[in-house]
Regions:
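Active-site-proximal helices and loops of the catalytic beta/alpha 8
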Residues: 1-80, 132, 149-180
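Aromatic/acidic polysaccharide-binding cleft in carbohydrate-active enzymes
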Residues: 29, 79-111, 130-172
Length: 183
């Protein structure tokens, strides 16, 4: 892909998806390789801090400083709100899903329960998470639907169809707030 883009005088930014230590993730970033990776280590620490009331912000601060120590202040790592392998942030923030349930159980939950957002505070939590991701070093990456609070448990429930219209008031409000953060 990069060779073709170089011949045409264009640059293609390539970001990877690797779970593991900072060293493992960094090993795929180099000239002729990936430009960046999703920062899952930061995401996995940010998720409970923003989704729950009980988590300590120091945990997030430590994870952010570890990310900066490994990738530098001016890096291209992806600050994600979620991805296709994880349940949706808003379903954690809503309290529908918890952090104690085994990861593979979320797949069954997605098939057997109608996961919807019940707690409107979850939209505010997601807005704060967006603001955090857009103001720290790296590139903010919003998983489709997270701009308005699409719920979901495990795969395939977290891959619901994107809604482009007829959003609920609180979904439209979050979408507008997210749009404001971007512009």
């Amino acid at each position: 892909v990069k060779l073709i883009s170089q011949k045409k005088g264009k640059y293609i930014y390539q970001i990877g998806e690797t779970y593991g230590s900072h060293d493992l993730i960094k090993s795929y970033i180099n000239s002729g390789m990936l430009d960046a990776q999703f920062d899952f280590n930061l995401y996995d620490n940010a998720l409970p801090v923003f989704a729950l009331k009980s988590e300590d912000m120091r945990r997030l601060g430590d994870a952010l400083m570890s990310s900066i120590a490994n990738y530098g202040y001016h890096h291209l790592m992806g600050n994600i709100t979620g991805n296709q392998d994880k349940p949706r942030f808003i379903s954690y923030a809503d309290g529908t899903l918890d952090f104690e349930t085994p990861w593979m159980e979320y797949k069954r939950i997605g098939w057997t329960q109608d996961i919807q957002v019940q707690d409107t505070l979850a939209y505010k939590k997601l807005a704060l998470f967006h603001a955090f991701n857009m103001t720290i070093p790296g590139i903010p990456i919003i998983y489709y639907g997270d701009e308005y609070g699409l719920p979901g448990a495990g795969d395939p429930d977290n891959r619901r169809m994107m809604q482009f219209e007829n959003l609920k008031d609180r979904e439209e409000s979050l979408r507008q707030e997210t749009k404001g953060l971007i512009t």
